[in-house]
Amino acid sequence: MFFSLTLGLVASSCDNAANTNEDSDFRYLADEFADIKVIRYRIPGWEQLDLSQKEYIYYLSEAAKYGRDIFWQQNFRHGLEVRKTLETIINNYDGDKNSAEFKEFLTYAKRVFFSNGIHHHYAEEKFIPECDKEYFAKLMRDTGLEESVENMIPIIYDKSLYKYRKNISGEGDLLLQSSVNFYENVSRKEAEEYYSSIEDPEDPTPVSYGLNSKLIKRDGEIYEEVYKIDGLYGDAISKVVEYLDKAAEVAENETQKHYISLLTDYYKTGNLETWDEFNVAWVKDTSSRIDFINGFVETYNDPLGMKATWEAVVNFKDIEASKRTKIISDNAQWFEDNSPVDERFKKEKVKGVSAKVITVAQLGGDCHPTSPLGINLPNADWIRKEHGSKSVTIANISEAYDKAAQESPKNMTTEFSWDSKETELLKKYNTVTNNLHTDLHECLGHGSGQLLEGTSPNALKEYSSPLEEARADIFALYYLADPKLVELGILPDMEAYKASYISYIRNGIFTQFVRIDEGKDVTQAHMQGRKMIAEWCYEHGKENNIIEKRSKDGKTYFVINDFEALRSLFGELLSELQRIKSEGDYDAGKNLIETYGMKIDPQLHKEVKKRYASLNLKPYGGFINPDI
């Protein structure tokens, strides 16, 4: 609510969002500032839901909103203090709001609201207001915050304080030098020793140790403070539970009521075995129209890849579009059997793979305002193996991204394509292959393969996230060029996959660097995975000129000369990534990411930033939720 208001926007009501399919004046692009664009999204199909389904979505959406403060506190222990300071100034300052300094302050506030904290949501580094600290202090004094000035100004302006959300410098202790609020006075060595002492490597169904807790060291004692109603974040969790209980009363069926009850029990107790029970029950529900995610789910923000941020997504099934993903899930065993990985690492029997295309009605926590385009859950490997997984592709969010891009007069396709043939190929096939890549990544990629007996799910530690995203990405890339997809009717012809290969290699090795400040490394998990794949293939294909670096009119281009050979490289790297995961080969995984996934050629970086700047585009996008 506040995020929308500070942008000077009024989010569409849900009915309006659904009806704007007929509204030629509807604009997806709502605001732009710094390196960010803010986008509105529609909810097609809302009018086809009955009243009880809409009521169910309403209560689930309210539950999604009440977890917001949890995520802010997880990102940074002073996060809420900063946000409330900014809110107070915006709501109470009665001075000149047209001055350059106030506009600089407002841009900073928007960036903080967008990132859910004072650190860049992708680059991890703390960003500083462009207005000077004396002006900021004056704003605080003018709005009744004089007593907080001494503490707040260093938090916001001191570049040496809280420098990184997640320590990406390679210097100092990984945990002690991170600002995320998952650990307190605990070093990496202490955290790893603590969890090693309580993990049972022989347990075939291990809980996700540390997932829903903060690890604290006080008076020489290390202990967990668990997220639950009578524990950490209890006030927010109690409101989430309140609205989940209301949702259960109007749920579509008894199955939903059952797993909502398990979820609220988990929130009350913090018991991770109950969390697993919920996930098993939830993943088996493949017939309900309405679905949701609500909980401490993804571990990307934890430097050790163990502790999860809170997130929520409320959605309903796009029945027509889901026909494509059903074909994929129905053939999951074929894809597993024909994967180019060692037979030891394959599942003998793929269980419970379900896939659908969804329409999002509400985003919350770590999924708002920046949203994923696809999701595959649960994350526990043993649940995936024994009970399956749910994979979703988010149609209306993907559409909003595409439509917002079309509202800009310039685009990256023309600027970075070698010739008109490439441009036309991308225009013809890119939307189809992008959606299919997401389907394959989420539905099959994450769920493919298995750990060898005795391999810890946490063996890859801080490299687990980029390696897992790369594994799912390259699984999808490998199969995009398989004639099976044409045979199944989900790929139009055998030219289409080339669009995906072109855009993926170009992005991974070059254009994604527009998101990163010059002189900095790649730090975000998905970006590291993409760079590692593209760079590895470029280097390993050099002898045969599979991917060629060309120059024209002083500009650099990366051109694929042999698509079939590139697919073979994808298969080779997929095999190695699966081996690394199945065996828990930390050193090999670390070597891949550090060698190919982090360092950027400074000349390429400078060039891509300059060319991108000429397009006047914003590299990051996020969304305003509709009011329901």
Language-model features: where?
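Contiguous, non-catalytic segments that form substrate-binding/exosite surfaces or channel walls
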Residues: L106-K217, E224-E422, N430
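Long, well-structured alpha-helical subdomains associated
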Residues: F71, L477-I580
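An active-site-proximal "capping" alpha-helix that borders the catalytic cofactor pocket
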Residues: D50, N253, S465-D482
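C-terminal motif of bacterial Sec signal peptides marking the signal peptidase cleavage site
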Residues: L9-S13
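Post-HEXXH active-site segment of zinc metalloproteases
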Residues: G449-A470
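Short alpha-helix carrying the canonical HExxH Zn2+-binding catalytic motif
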Residues: T431-L444
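Catalytic Zn2+-binding segment of zinc metalloproteases
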Residues: C443-T455, Y479, P483
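Extended, compositionally biased alpha-helical segments that mediate assembly or anchoring
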Residues: F558-I628
